[in-house]
Amino acid sequence: MKTDLLACRHIGVNKADAEVMLRKIGVASLDELIDKTIPANIRLKAPLALPAPMTEYEFARHIAELAGKNKLFTTYIGMGWYNTITPAVIQRNVFENPVWYTSYTPYQTEVSQGRLEALMNFQTAVCDLTAMPLANCSLLDEATAAAEAVTMMYGLRSRNQQKAGANVVFIDENIFPQTLAVITTRAIPQGIEIRTGKFRDLEFTDDLFACVLQYPNANGNAEDYREFTEKAHTANCKVAVAADILSLALLTPPGEWGADIVFGTTQRLGTPMFYGGPSAGYFATRDEYKRNMPGRIIGWSKDKYGKLCYRMALQTREQHIKREKATSNICTAQALLATMAGFYTVYHGQEGIRNIASRIHSITVFLEKSIGKLGFKQVNKQYFDTLRFILPDSVSAQQIRTIALSKEVNLRYFDNGDVGLSIDETTDVAAANILLSIFAIAAGKDFQKVDDIPEATIISEELKRQTPYLTHEVFSKYHTETEMMRYIKRLDRKDISLAQSMISLGSCTMKLNAAAEMLPLSCAEFMCMHPLVPEDQAAGYRELIHNLSEELKVITGFAGVSLQPNSGAAGEYAGLRTIRAYLESIGQGHRNKVLIPASAHGTNPASAIQAGFTTVTCACDEHGNVDMDDLRAKAEENKDDLAALMITYPSTHGIFETEIVEICQIIHACGAQVYMDGANMNAQVGLTNPGFIGADVCHLNLHKTFASPHGGGGPGVGPICVAEHLVPFLPGHGLFGNSQNEVSAAPFGSAGILPITYGYIRMMGAEGLTMATKTAILNANYLAACLKDTYGIVYRGANGFVGHEMILECRKVYEETGISENDIAKRLMDYGYHAPTLSFPVHGTLMIEPTESESLSELDNFVLTMLTIWNEIQEVKNGEADKEDNVLINAPHPEYEVVSDQWEHCYTREKAAYPIESVRENKFWVNVARVDNTLGDRKLLPTCYGCFD
């Protein structure tokens, strides 16, 4: 392999390292290991037919060429996406900082205090601006947040409503079309009927359970919904409002006029449009609905010594716990973008946010009056940033379009011939003059350029916001760049990311996010593209999307791809809806059961339920494989109604099951489809693939297998790949005149992430991708060989090897010493490591996945750490350490405890803080001691203002 290729930088072990590792494993070669790990009948017969790999320099030139094909016109289309200004201090120190973008979801509280605080800021800003008491720390986008709101309100129906079968949700006709489309996709399988119309004309019938409104609406008009909301509540209907969060700096927030749920996007709080995403959706609601709200919630708690700290609260609501009983399948969301939006509000504060909103509104007022003088009638009586014009008889929309395009301007064109525009943070006086000139030329009239636009408003007193927001001190302390930079740095020092050490989370694939892959995201031609611009303006994006789709087809062995799903869970849902649409097309729509192994991740059953199926659980045998007898029995028992099998491969237990082809054949013989969960695709690429194995559809996690970052809990991308017969049923989009199964707001989902995966594939090439897979399997088996004689490995494949991850046995340790897998996980923090996956998929164990990116020296240091912890466990077992006071049950040890004048433990400070030599050279200090989870759930405090009595 050429040394100037990315593979040499991405893969952590070299040939000499591999030989050492193979000897430890007990095989003669890497090929022998792979042959003994992956069943021969599913091995690909030829290398992947991918383009030759590019060097990093060649890719930089190639991606710049693609970016150059994108035409960055000034866009006023609006409809949920707006140009914005990302403060350089946030772009440089957060968006482009691997400490922030390579970290994992903050389940491990003690090594996540920085991003937990940043997400708490986000929640607080959302609560303040919406005037709601509770918010989560992001959803995927506005449209999916709307669908979650409808599902949540459906679950909140009163007993009488449930008994009466109330199943109608009213959607005001002036909602964004992409939002209505996604709600429709989610509502149909739940048995929810959608009724659209004018909110003023609605009759509250007994079958109605909820209403969804847009504020300001899709035309830009800010309606006064107070009377309507009162009527809805009188009729026992809940009200959800899609609100432009920046407009709430000036408009009366929905929380003040009775909304039950407020949702939307925070894209315009400093996040670029990225041709549709990623950006953080938001969701706020009443306190009494906290256990029904989808998504993750950050709350306050205390550590064991009483120090205030943050944690993820009410986790038992989530799909990985509740499985088929979950009311949402949301998992990965948009944590990195929520973090950026939170920092945006911190940096600007109340005054800055109000000034930005006021400037936008003032320019809009100026344009309404100035364009109105040219003979155009503006229809919105109350508005924030959006105008809709009826054209005079002498002017056509096509004339306007032609003139606008000649000035490199995009406007919004309505089906009835009206023309609209939405002003944003980047609009200045010069831009306003250009807009004015477009309408003047079309009308054949002169206009006077202006040098300044005074502050003005048309918002009535009834709709004008009177209450303060962002009043917590965090929103007033960091308005200089120096203070902001130091605040961000102060937070990132509290977190473990890949910049610190290996993150061995099983089933999460925390691999390198190479700088060469990440750089294109800071390119304006990729950052600043609106998703609804004419296709020729996005030629670079479209070419990249086409190329990437073709490459993913090759890698998966499938015929079609949709890049629309914004996460793995969204991919699962999209894949199941695709299966449903296909079955209905062949007269098999009655099939409503999905077979799922007991070992599956909780998103599988949660997604199946959301897609309108019922689940049937299939047992696993003592070796961790699908119990074939139980599978056959369940398939036969349900064959007339069986729609699909959902299966992860290699299994969630980290094993390549030898019967996988037969499993697919059994399901197909019943007339059902095989859905392969691609969470473990990192063990397949180049060696086998879902299509070759016999699956019909799979989703991929770009943030796992294909090198896009986790971002502390998103953004993720979950494209689905399907066999030929399913291609016609892939998610569509209104932009293409086909809204079937639409699952996200933007036509290509989080398109801004795609250059990362495209770069990964283009720079790795077929040989590099295949070697990455082999090395991931090598690294996992090396760790298994090093740890098998102490902890023990729970499951192995037919020939005694694991796949790309393995499950470490900890149950016997607990039986003998009382030391739990959680104690081991917390002790790892003292050594500078993030915990592996706890108690999944087997309770009382740790699941470890090292990925191909780690070096032998890092793997050996991790082994030394685990063996040293093993010795610490033996000290407890042998009575050398106190069972009630030892380094494990007291872990982690924060700096403030170690340097305290009081030290009353039975072991030394050195043993607590510097257990091995490598820690002395690279010590990570936790900021808090072990956190009290019960306290944080017993009293949920989800904003910066919260405190304990």
Swiss-Prot record:
It catalyses: N(6)-[(R)-lipoyl]-L-lysyl-[glycine-cleavage complex H protein] + glycine + H(+) = N(6)-[(R)-S(8)-aminomethyldihydrolipoyl]-L-lysyl-[glycine-cleavage complex H protein] + CO2. CDD domains: GDC-P. Keywords: Oxidoreductase, Pyridoxal phosphate. The modification N6-(pyridoxal phosphate)lysine is found at K704. Its EC number is 1.4.4.2. Disulfide bonds: none annotated. GO terms for biological process: glycine decarboxylation via glycine cleavage system. InterPro entries: GcvP, GDC-P_C, GDC-P_N, GDC_P, PyrdxlP-dep_Trfase, PyrdxlP-dep_Trfase_major, PyrdxlP-dep_Trfase_small. Pfam families: GcvP2_C, GDC-P. One of its GO terms (molecular function) is pyridoxal phosphate binding. It is an enzyme of class 1 (oxidoreductase). One of its GO terms (cellular component) is cytosol. It comes from the Bacteria. The glycine cleavage system catalyzes the degradation of glycine. The P protein binds the alpha-amino group of glycine through its pyridoxal phosphate cofactor; CO(2) is released and the remaining methylamine moiety is then transferred to the lipoamide cofactor of the H protein. Belongs to the GcvP family. The glycine cleavage system is composed of four proteins: P, T, L and H. This is Glycine dehydrogenase (decarboxylating).
